[in-house]
Amino acid sequence: MLEKQPDIDAVALCMPPQHRYQAAHAALTAGKHVFMEKPPGATLSEVADLEKLAQAKGVTLFASWHSRHAPAVQVMKAFLARHAPTRVEVIWKEDVRHWHPGQEWIWEAGGLGVFDPGINALSIVTEILPNAMFLKSGVLEFPANRDAPIAADLHFTDATGLAAHAAFDWRQTGKQSWEINVTTDAGELRMADGGAKLWIAGVAQELPEEGEYPSLYRHFASLVNSGRSDVDLSPLRHVADAFMLGKRKEVDAFES
């Protein structure tokens, strides 16, 4: 594509993370701005290398997190800047057969498994919390015939003693659950539908109408126009921590 259309200014990469590095490296080397869909790569190190290359070439690299652009996210962030959170509960459960039918790459090493949706929740939590959190313990459930987990149960904290828990599961049928609940001294924040709905102290909030992807591309254009990059790897770092610190539990084989 780069050879056939040398006049393009930017590319957006949405292929599986195991194959992202080569495409991004080629585009950056050719002097193109690069928008990477989440997750930005299969490893932290390869994305860090791409960030250095973008800086050397003077082009923009945007490691995007689409869920951070959900309508409720900035409202929650502003509220938590004023009212310290004491507890966070994340429930991110969906049906993998519905959302990823026949996609074998997602079960391979580097495909993230249940962390493919779970990283969306982590991208929101790392955006809204006033302090950085870190993993304390976790259990990752691997089907006997797969190299990536189908479920994860994670416990986090931060320097203030925050209690944060996340439950990810790819086996939920029927209604899907993309929820984050945050306890504060001014009431509970309850986010639902991946950030499309929000209640504060039981009161439904009016939220911006702009969708995630129009907001994402507007931000990308702003980065390009101002000569900046945006490469926040904190959600991916939490996933790496989970694989490093979490206990592995083998469960029944899973066929998609």
Where are these regions (language model features)?
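C-terminal helix-rich "cap/oligomerization" subdomain common to oxidoreductases
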Residues: 9-13, 159, 219-256
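A contiguous active-site-proximal alpha/beta segment in oxidoreductase catalytic domains
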Residues: 18, 41-99
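A general structural signal for well-ordered alpha-helical segments in protein cores
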Residues: 20, 24, 47, 73, ...
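Hydrophobic residues in well-ordered beta-strands that form the structural core
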Residues: 36-37, 61-63, 191
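Rossmann-like dinucleotide-binding domain that binds NAD(P)(H)
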Residues: 101-174, 234-238
